[in-house]
Amino acid sequence: MPFPSDVIYRINLAWINTVDDLTEILRKHKNHKIFLDLPIRRTKPPENRYSIDNLMPIIKNFLNIRYLAVSNVNSRDDVLDIQNKLPDNITLVPKIESILGIENIKSITDSVKNKEKIIMLDHDDLYRSVEKDNEPISRFQNSINILIEFCKENGIVLLRTRGVIFSDD
């Protein structure tokens, strides 16, 4: 199925087995902007098979890669570790999946150097985090509301994982 030319193609690297597989996908979609989603400290299968260092040659060679989401961001240190390695043309997107990440959202977003600030919220993982920490379930929705309000007040784009587009390529 062809995608419209203005689609930003998200690639969840948890599901890409090798760097060669990623390279093949990127070649196939060379005319689309690419949003890479790098799982770090993943707690559910599949496990990530490579690091940001493994990806740097690819990120530097494929200029259509515009965004890099990094999962399980809980502090500004999580952002700085990766951001210092990225070329300036890549927008780093911290992916928030825990109450701790929401509690630290100001320092996280302040540490992102990109002009356009974007964060990503994974509802499912946030819910699991609330359950795992034996927090009241009401904390889940309250935390989402806090994050939404923070983003509105600070001009930050909030991407919310609410659905998936499936593809066989």
Task: Give the role of each language-model region.
Residues M1-D169:
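Non-catalytic helical/linker scaffolds that mediate oligomerization, partner binding
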